[in-house]
């Protein structure tokens, strides 16, 4: 590990140790009323958003805690311990608000003994780096919208998004340092893996967000414009570590994402009966072709900066 990376690592570990958000994720005493009384049009999609968020946060907690338990390196143990702490705190905070909706999410299945699938560390680095950074971009974009238009803040949880997303950003910085400390992860055939994970994360978000039209409407956000803004922020941040980037400004990128979303909607409407029906098989093939088109679009080459730490300035 180079001296530059070591110095930056020590600075980042100090930030984790200070734990500036230790008291942030608490529901205030003056916010104990029931906040589940929201517009019926947005109710289901907002609840789905909360449930998917708590599942994601708790999954991250389980992953990081498991890695901490298995690694031998003291630096890694400290890092994954800090990140598991943060993810657990986020999940617990969402759960405080879900109680208003009389919803208890049973996440015990994530911790029960099961057969583990082992992935090479590089795959975890690529995927979790992107997950944390795109999480930052998503939360800060929503926060800036309700900060600018307070009348759109239909639930108090949005007030926490600014500091919340800074936790996500800091986690991403840790993975950036890990990858920059090992140049082999960022060249050769690994460039194809980086491109694959970029596309998989972006495409998943695009498809999912277009299934929540009323939630975005309540925030006066177009799902497409919101997603493209998030992609722009994530792409800009990713320049710190990825030598290859998606050309999100290429008109064919958005065109194929829209087609991917449309085909996915068609697949869901076809139901689960006759899972191997001709119609469903055709849709699966079309989805695969569409994703392949996106993958083989020309990428952008990015020269990695020497000073690669990024500040959450969006």
Walk through the language-model features, giving the residues of each:
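Non-heme di-metal
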Residues: 1-314
């Amino acid at each position: 590990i180079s001296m530059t990376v070591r110095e930056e690592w020590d600075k980042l570990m100090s930030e984790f140790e200070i734990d500036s958000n230790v008291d942030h994720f608490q529901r205030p005493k003056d916010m104990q009323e029931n906040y589940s009384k929201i517009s019926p049009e947005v109710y289901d999609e907002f609840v789905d958003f909360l449930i998917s968020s708590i599942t994601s946060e708790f999954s991250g907690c389980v992953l990081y805690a498991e890695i901490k338990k298995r690694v031998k390196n003291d630096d890694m143990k400290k890092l994954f311990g800090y990140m598991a702490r943060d993810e657990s705190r986020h999940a617990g905070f969402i759960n405080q608000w879900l109680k208003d909706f009389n919803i208890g999410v049973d996440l015990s299945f994530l911790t029960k003994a099961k057969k583990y699938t082992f992935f090479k560390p590089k795959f975890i680095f690529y995927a979790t780096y992107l997950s944390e950074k795109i999480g930052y971009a998503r939360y800060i974009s929503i926060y800036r919208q309700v900060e600018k238009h307070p009348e759109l803040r239909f639930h108090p949880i949005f007030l926490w998004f600014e500091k919340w997303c800074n936790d996500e950003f800091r986690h991403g910085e840790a993975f950036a340092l890990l990858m920059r400390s090992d140049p082999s992860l960022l060249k050769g055939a690994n460039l194809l893996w980086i491109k694959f994970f970029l596309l998989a994360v972006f495409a998943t978000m695009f498809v999912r967000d277009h299934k929540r039209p009323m939630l975005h409407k309540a925030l006066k956000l177009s799902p497409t414009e919101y997603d493209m803004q998030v992609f722009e922020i994530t792409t800009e941040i990713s320049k710190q570590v990825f030598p290859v980037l998606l050309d999100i400004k290429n008109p064919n990128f958005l065109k194929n994402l829209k087609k991917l979303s449309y085909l996915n909607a068609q697949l869901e409407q076809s139901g689960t009966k006759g899972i191997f029906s001709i119609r469903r098989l055709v849709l699966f093939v079309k989805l695969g072709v569409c994703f392949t088109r996106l993958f083989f679009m020309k990428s952008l080459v990015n020269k990695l900066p020497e000073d690669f730490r990024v500040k959450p300035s969006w």
